[in-house]
């Protein structure tokens, strides 16, 4: 059928092209993940290579699946009753070989052969005497009459019956024997005079061989070999199979797909075992069960996906940590779905949002402090008595043409990633506006950020205790496997009890995670100017810069205790070489913090770093809205 011909041709071409596909896939995969930056030196290169190996597994799994489908679609060889092939007038005395029913193999335009059934049958040696009826056989071997089991005679085409194996190649002895047989068949002389005598001798020997084979098959289980070797009928005029001089060239003898097999009964079984043991990957794949192919494909895809994830995130440990967060639902797989699951807040129902809506344009980010919350909004978001008294902060992000991840990443970081600790600013709630124009975060209000508080009330600040709480909050974040990546004085806030809390988790990331560089100019570590990732040492550098700015914000008339030790510590923390910077654990053990017990710091019983009742907000019901400055304005403020 045309469909079967198409499937057979596709399978043959695919099997020949598979090594090329694997070679090209190997080269592309390894070149794609080859390190191109100085940051990729060291152990990360191993996981770059792992991504390539995983890609190879994936490619091989896909190829195996396609080949398996093509094998199923290819025409199946049906085997009929075992018949005996008789080579007339051969100068080499050969034993009879069992063969199934065969058909003419198409040799025009392609060396590919078809193995479907034909209507012509070869007769067995036991039927020859009855078929001839005492007559001499014809001298023309090409037009000799062949009788089947039913006694019906047919005229075979001018062709030679040659057993061909599609699996493992023969050894040298079998090839020489097959070549000699082919030469004898190709060099027949139709005009020889001893045709009758030779035919009669071969009839007798063939009958004895057939009886021996029947007894052998009855004594031991029959081994079916027609899955690995089958017979095809090839035209003697084919230039590749039968050269003009009647002999096979060395190239033709060594060709795997055209191996000749002339065996007896027991040698036939031994040849089947040799073919089975020496089978290549294609035969193993065809004999493999379906579940094994599916498992190989799934394994390849999993290894490829994990290799790519390790390369993307910066290593296998980071990839496993991120996938673990996915499984624990602390890191959403779909940010759009996470955004759509946020509760809806109707801005028209609450007076706190009246002056926010006019500012909602593309890319707008607003922060509004609300010292006095209306009863309607307090009941809607479920505020407790203390928060109703101190007020809230509404952080607004415009959703016009904005990515879902940028809108809700900080929401998820506050809710799921940041540990529950008194030195972190908690989140009250997150909502999407009914107008679909913004996402709102509700946070508890603080007195001010550290920078503004130190500028306004420098005499009410205990610098060493404030620095200790700032270092400890960052240390807790690192111990839970996260980086802040935007440490600065404006991201530390002073609560109403006078202690420090860390906020603004929009840039928080997993330790050693490969992500774009974020932060504020003036706090960037020197290594971030190159193609590298955030590390714990980059947060240490930013924290050292923050402590330096904290001292600079103090007025010149204010005396700072232990200033010499503080400058020595900040100098170590801001070293250009990341290897020379201390870890946060070493920072807490520095002589500057002698007398501070970090294990009891969470109890907040060692003093208050920010004394007084200073608040940056005006005590009006509407609150004061703060629009964050641009990066250029923020940089100018930091350099003042």
UniProtKB/Swiss-Prot annotation:
Top-level enzyme category: transferase
Signal peptide: 1-70
Outcome following mutation: residue 486 to S: Loss of catalytic activity. At the tachyzoite stage, loss of the intravacuolar network (IVN) tubules which appear to be replaced with large multilamellar vesicles
Subcellular localization(s) per the UniProt record: Cytoplasmic granule; Secreted; Parasitophorous vacuole lumen
Substitution effect: residue 393 to A: Severe loss of catalytic activity
Phenotype upon changing residue 361 to A: Severe loss of catalytic activity
Documented EC number(s): 2.7.11.1
Outcome of gene disruption: In C57BL/6 mice infected with knockout tachyzoites (type II strain Prugniaud), the number of cysts formed in the brain is severely reduced compared to infection with wild type tachyzoites. Parasite virulence is not affected. In vitro, the ability to differentiate to cyst stages is normal. In BALB/c mice infected with knockout tachyzoites (type I strain RH), virulence is not affected. At the tachyzoite stage, loss of the intravacuolar network (IVN) tubules which appear to be replaced with large multilamellar vesicles.
Pfam families named among the record's database cross-references: Pkinase
Co-factor requirement: Mg(2+)
UniProt site (Cleavage): 260-261
Residues that hold ATP according to the record: 395
GO CC terms of this entry: extracellular region
Entry text on domains: The protein kinase domain has an atypical kinase fold which lacks the glycine-rich loop that is critical for ATP binding in canonical protein kinase domains.
Record function comment: Serine/threonine-protein kinase which, at the tachyzoite stage, phosphorylates several parasitophorous vacuole (PV)-resident proteins such as GRA2, GRA6 and GRA7. By phosphorylating GRA2 and GRA6, regulates the formation of a functional intravacuolar network (IVN); IVN is composed of membranous tubules that bud from the PV membrane into the vacuolar lumen. Plays a role in the establishement of chronic infection in the host by controlling cyst formation in the host tissues.
Family designation: Belongs to the protein kinase superfamily. STE Ser/Thr protein kinase family. WNG subfamily.
Name the UniProt record assigns to this protein: Serine/threonine-protein kinase WNG1
Organism of this sequence: Toxoplasma gondii
Lineage: Eukaryota, Sar, Alveolata, Apicomplexa, Conoidasida
Gene that produces this protein: ROP35
């Amino acid at each position: 059928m045309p469909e079967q011909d198409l499937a057979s041709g596709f399978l043959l071409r695919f099997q020949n092209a598979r090594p090329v596909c694997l070679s090209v896939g190997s080269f592309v995969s390894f070149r794609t993940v080859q390190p191109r930056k100085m940051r990729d030196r060291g152990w990360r290169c191993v996981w770059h290579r792992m991504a390539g190996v995983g890609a190879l597994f994936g490619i091989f799994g896909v190829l195996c699946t396609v080949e398996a489908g093509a094998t199923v679609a290819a025409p199946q060889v049906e085997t009929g009753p075992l018949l005996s092939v008789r080579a007339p007038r051969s100068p080499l005395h050969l034993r009879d070989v069992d063969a199934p029913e065969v058909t003419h193999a198409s040799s025009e335009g392609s060396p590919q052969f078809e193995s479907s059934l034909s209507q012509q049958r070869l007769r067995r040696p036991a039927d020859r005497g009855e078929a001839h009826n005492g007559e001499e056989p014809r001298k023309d071997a090409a037009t000799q009459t062949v009788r089947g089991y039913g006694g019906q005679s047919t005229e075979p085409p001018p062709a030679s019956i040659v057993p061909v194996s599609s699996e493992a190649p023969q050894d040298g002895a079998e090839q020489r024997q097959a070549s000699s047989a082919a030469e004898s068949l190709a060099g027949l002389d139709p005009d020889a005079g001893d045709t009758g005598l030779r035919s009669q001798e071969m009839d007798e020997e063939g009958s004895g061989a057939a009886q021996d084979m029947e007894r052998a098959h009855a004594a031991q289980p029959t081994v079916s070999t027609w899955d690995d070797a089958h017979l095809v009928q090839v035209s003697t005029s084919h230039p590749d199979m039968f050269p003009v001089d009647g002999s096979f060239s060395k190239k033709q003898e060594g060709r795997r797909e055209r191996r000749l097999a002339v065996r007896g009964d027991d040698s036939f079984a031994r040849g089947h075992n040799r073919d089975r043991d020496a089978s290549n990957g294609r035969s193993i794949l065809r004999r493999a069960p379906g579940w094994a192919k599916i498992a190989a494909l799934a394994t390849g895809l999993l290894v490829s996906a994990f290799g790519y994830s390790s390369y993307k995130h910066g290593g296998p440990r980071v990839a496993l940590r991120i996938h673990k967060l996915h499984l624990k639902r602390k890191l959403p797989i779909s940010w759009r779905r996470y955004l759509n699951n946020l509760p809806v807040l109707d801005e028209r129902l609450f007076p706190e949002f009246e002056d926010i809506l006019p500012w909602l344009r593309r890319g707008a980010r607003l922060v509004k402090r609300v010292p006095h919350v209306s009863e309607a909004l307090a009941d809607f978001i479920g505020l407790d008595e203390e928060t109703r008294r101190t007020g809230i902060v509404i952080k607004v992000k415009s959703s016009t043409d904005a990515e879902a991840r940028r809108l809700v990443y900080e929401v998820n970081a506050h809710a799921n990633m940041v540990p529950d600790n008194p030195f972190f600013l908690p989140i009250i709630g997150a909502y999407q506006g009914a107008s679909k124009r913004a996402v709102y975060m509700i946070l508890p209000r603080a007195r001010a950020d550290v920078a503004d508080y130190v500028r306004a009330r420098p005499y009410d600040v205990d610098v060493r205790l404030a620095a200790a709480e700032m270092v400890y909050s960052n240390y807790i974040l690192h111990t839970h496997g996260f980086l802040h990546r935007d440490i600065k004085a404006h991201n530390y806030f002073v609560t109403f009890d006078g202690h420090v809390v860390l906020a603004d988790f929009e840039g928080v990331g997993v330790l050693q995670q490969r992500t774009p560089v974020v932060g504020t100019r003036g706090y960037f570590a020197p290594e971030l100017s190159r193609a590298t990732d955030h590390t714990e040492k980059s947060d240490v550098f930013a924290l050292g810069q923050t402590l330096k700015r904290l001292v600079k914000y103090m007025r010149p008339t204010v005396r700072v205790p232990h200033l010499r030790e503080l400058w020595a510590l900040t100098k170590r923390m801001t070293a250009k070489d990341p290897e020379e910077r201390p870890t946060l654990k070493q920072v807490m053990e520095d002589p500057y913090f002698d007398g501070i017990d970090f294990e009891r710091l969470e109890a907040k019983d060692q003093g208050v770093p920010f004394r007084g009742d200073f608040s940056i907000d005006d005590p009006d019901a509407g609150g004061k809205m703060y629009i964050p400055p641009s990066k250029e304005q923020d940089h100018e403020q930091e350099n003042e």
